[in-house]
Amino acid sequence: FLAEGMADTVRRAVNPQLTLGPERGGAQFRFEVPEGAVCRRENLGGMEVATCTLRPDTRDEDLRYLTQAVAEGLRCVPSRTSYCVGAVVALPDGRSFTGYTHETSPTHHAEQEAIRKALDAGAELRGAAIYSSMEPCSQRKSEPESCTQLILRHGFARVVFALYEPDRFVCCRGAQTLREAGVDVRVYPELAEGVRRANAHLGR
């Protein structure tokens, strides 16, 4: 679970008197703190208890930006050959850039539009977050690079979306590919209904 980034918090209780076997030289057992974790230690009943937060609580911020991305998706002109999607690029310095499907080009996806605006403004995208109303595509026919590849190429640290892409046009594996590459991927299905409304022209 730790290696796959599937845990937000880890709590470990260790008896400080516990030692390893002779083959380990009788070394005292210690809890290895995960890299990047913020830990609080306390002593409870003679046990050394470490509570480590692996990922910060970003729910409020995520929902705010993701709600904005869903609203951007409603600005799309409906098409029978593509989804109406909205996206927001959020930088650590507080700046953000929005985009929606086909905003400036009939082949551009929402993520492309938002990323292009950020780059035009001279933004450094490595370590930034991108919010998309729908899972970033992992393959496409209209352009040589998928949104998942674009996100990885620019070094985004986090990807947040509301709805997994249905298998209507292609079989999307964007979230899986991003997670395997070490990107922090979070999904908020409570906002998915707004994405479905934006794509009602395609049916359920």
Where is each model-derived feature located?
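Zinc-dependent deaminase
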Residues: 46-78, 140-204
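Stable alpha-helical structural segments in soluble proteins, enriched in small hydrophobic residues
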Residues: 3, 10, 69, 110, ...
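Short, glycine-anchored, charge-dense loop/turn motifs used at functional sites
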Residues: 92-96
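Short linear motifs in low-complexity or flexible loops
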Residues: 3, 7-22, 27, 37-38
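N-terminal beta-alpha supersecondary unit
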Residues: 99-115
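Mobile, glycine- and charge-enriched loop segments
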Residues: 111-141
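Short beta-strand scaffold segments in enzyme catalytic cores
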Residues: 84-91
